[in-house]
Amino acid sequence: MAQHVTLERAECSAQLAPWVENYWSLRWDLPPDTSYLSSTLPHPACNLSVERGIRRDGVDDDPVVVTGVVTRRFDVTIRGAGWVYAAKFRPGGLAALTGAHARDLRDVTVAATTVFDPATTDALRDLAGTDGGRETFDDALARLATTPTDDYLLLLEVIAAMLADRSLLRVAEVEQRCGVGTRTLQRLFERYVGVTPKWVLSRYRMHDVVTDLDAGYGGSLADLAAKYGWFDQAHFTREFTDLIGVPPGSYQRRER
């Protein structure tokens, strides 16, 4: 199936880098009567995408859509031929760039016109394929770029610490590391990210679990869970299964 589906990533312009993590594209041309399940683990990021060949509920067939932070595994089944070109925002980046409230977008896909101005969405709607995606997105989003606020820069600092230091297992440890109070941290995540700091930290550590298993970890799953902050094995198994689709033991055996 790999020869029929192509996933690529590209950098955005330096002007947009404070808000946009990267661009990504998916192209497919599947044989008749076949389908491909595209699965994505939850990340604390919103996406702005132009989609051709995919039908989304609730967007009135508008190809330019915004998908908020998804709190469970995100599955899309593709058939026939089509493509997607998208901007993946940094955690909090969409809200910081547009003024949208991230919590309102959590676990939903909406027409981009509900978040962006008509000039931006019209420019993206004219995109005819993935080849010109980078330039089109750069040009469309550049008009929104301003100077990042101090609050947003503080949020990015916190997110960077969560990502870089695998030993951070509790929100209190993050607060101490970054010198941020509990109320301030909760307010930043509520406003910009749309989910709690605890949820984001837990997702990052679960991504670390998957990374270790993909690298061939052969030790005890209880030890691996405890390493990343889960001391209740049943809780760890439920969270892993909800996100990955199979229990951690089955995933570990499959990766060996």
Model-flagged regions — what are they?
Residues F189, L201, F240-T241, Q252:
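DNA major-groove recognition helix of helix-turn-helix
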Residues H235-E239, V246:
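Extracellularly exposed regions in secreted/surface proteins, prominently low-complexity, repeat-rich
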Residues V76, R187, R191, H207-V209, ...:
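General helical structural elements
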